[in-house]
Amino acid sequence: MKMNLPDLAYTIMMNDKADKLLIKWKDTVILVGTPNDVFWMAQSCLVVTTIKYANRVYIINVEIEERVDGI
């Protein structure tokens, strides 16, 4: 099952499991922020591929999911 980035950020935010999320796409950091920041700023087309956790920081790799409707 694919999970998009805003959904994951919301889950982490509700469980109070992290202080920071570091979001990477193709080995490039594209966003660093609190789970709340990421929830409001991230796009649903960003799909989580891998997750690493250390010291209340999640390192999340994402890919861009292209949509049929072009949006």
Task: Identify what each model region corresponds to.
Residues M1-M3, I64-I71:
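Short intrinsically disordered terminal tails
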